[in-house]
């Protein structure tokens, strides 16, 4: 006898389900209810025979991953989070979802305070609309804002305009974060935080903090970690190089087991052997990011990041003075690249784009793995590793091409 099926119940059957703890896969069934994962079964679920065909989706052994989590991304699909209006934000979020990313932290580069406040207001308005039925399955989830500027070291500014940088002022930061509670993560050059007040204030406001765009010595970085910083923004990039007489922030991060290290695995930002070094030392705290900019998913040409002109050629973005200006990487490609560069399993690489970023920004109890109680964010892959279907909050976006550019 078939059981009465609650509204919004679906059993995904005959799947190769990702196991975050084992960094591997097992054949089983996944029961979803009300936008959440209700049950994960190894083998055939006892519920399978009791449910009507309409409530069972047999995926034919396809791989089912948690939705990917990108916590450092400035934009894609022709839009930048710093300037995008409501319509462009919808286009961008649809493009993220189609690529397999179900959760994003819109990342804002350095700008004047008024411009940052306005960008966060627009992003907040977009996030507030997520419960609208008309948007179900149409876009990735916004989990808060990553504030990458303005508190950076001018000597390691990268593509950030120097006139937009500011000293590390704890009072300014607190006013900023209290007025804009959507900021979840802050990048800062913490060697400029002489008395530690900036870091303490950020933590007291509920943000996580990463060291980045920094000239920090080994000792300065270790002090920042001891005081509460939990991550290093795009390891190796916009930091002093690893040196045998001065390890610097890179060495400090690699030797600190509890510090998350972000990597851009596009084959351009970091040499494969340096990716392998980080993978060997970091394991659970290696976090794949894209640092993507508006040209992602678009042809080569002229673009902008943080108001600065950027030329994209052969998929590589540079400012006119030659600085690397973000990437055009998709996170799923980053997963594949990481596995190839570091010589790790696909399952290990998936962890770095799902559970590890969720841990970095304090979202591991909500997303990042396929466990009961977590949000039903899924990525189902074809045999060739491309997205077959993407689900966000229990709703499929339909064809993986929907919203793509």
Regions found by a protein language model. Give the residues of each.
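C-terminal cap of metal-dependent C-N hydrolases
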Residues: 359, 369-405
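His/Asp/Glu-enriched, well-ordered alpha-helical/loop segment
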Residues: 248-261, 279-381
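N-terminal metal-binding scaffold of metallo-dependent hydrolase/deaminase domains
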Residues: 4-49, 391
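Active-site core of metal-dependent hydrolases
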Residues: 174, 178-298
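Active-site gating loops and adjacent loop-to-helix segments of metal-dependent hydrolytic enzymes
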Residues: 94-105, 153-180, 223-235, 239, ...
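Divalent metal-dependent hydrolysis catalytic cores, especially in the metallo-beta-lactamase
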Residues: 74, 90-122, 140-153, 180-191, ...
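Alpha-helical scaffold segments that flank or form the walls of functional sites
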Residues: 62-63, 71, 81-140, 164-179, ...
């Amino acid at each position: 006898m078939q059981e009465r099926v609650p509204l919004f119940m679906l059993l995904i059957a005959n799947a190769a389900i990702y196991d975050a703890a084992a960094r591997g896969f097992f054949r089983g069934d996944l029961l979803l209810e009300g936008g959440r994962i209700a049950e994960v079964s190894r083998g055939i679920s006892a519920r399978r025979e009791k449910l009507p065909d309409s409530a069972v989706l047999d995926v034919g052994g396809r791989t089912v991953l948690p939705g990917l989590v990108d916590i450092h991304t400035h934009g894609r699909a022709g839009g930048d989070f710093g300037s995008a209006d409501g319509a462009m934000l919808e286009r961008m979020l649809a493009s993220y979802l189609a690529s397999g990313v179900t959760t994003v932290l819109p990342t804002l580069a350095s700008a004047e305070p008024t411009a940052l406040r306005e960008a966060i207001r627009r992003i907040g308005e977009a996030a507030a609309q997520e419960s609208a039925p008309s948007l179900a399955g149409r876009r990735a989830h916004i989990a808060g804002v990553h504030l990458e500027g303005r508190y950076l070291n001018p000597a390691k500014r990268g593509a950030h305009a120097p006139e937009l940088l500011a000293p590390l002022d704890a009072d300014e930061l607190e006013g900023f974060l209290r007025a804009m509670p959507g900021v979840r993560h802050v990048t800062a050059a913490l060697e400029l935080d002489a008395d530690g007040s900036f870091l303490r204030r950020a933590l007291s406001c509920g943000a996580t903090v990463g060291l980045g765009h920094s000239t920090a010595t080994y000792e300065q970085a270790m002090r920042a970690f001891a005081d509460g910083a939990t991550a290093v923004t795009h390891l190796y990039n916009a930091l002093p190089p690893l040196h045998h007489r001065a390890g610097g922030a890179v060495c400090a991060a690699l030797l600190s087991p509890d510090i998350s290290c972000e990597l851009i695995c596009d084959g351009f930002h970091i040499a494969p052997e340096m990716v392998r070094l980080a993978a060997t030392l970091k394991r659970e705290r290696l976090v794949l990011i894209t640092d993507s900019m508006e040209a992602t998913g678009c042809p080569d040409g002229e673009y902008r990041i943080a108001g600065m002109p950027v030329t994209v050629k052969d998929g590589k973005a540079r400012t006119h003075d030659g600085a690397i200006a973000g990437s055009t990487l998709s996170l799923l490609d980053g997963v594949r690249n990481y596995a190839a560069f570091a010589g790790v399993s696909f399952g290990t690489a998936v962890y770095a784009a799902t559970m590890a970023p969720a841990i970095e920004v304090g979202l591991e109890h909500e997303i990042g793995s396929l466990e009961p109680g977590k949000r039903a964010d899924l990525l189902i892959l074809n045999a060739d590793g491309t997205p077959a279907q993407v689900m966000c909050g229990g709703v499929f976006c339909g064809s993986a091409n929907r919203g793509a550019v």
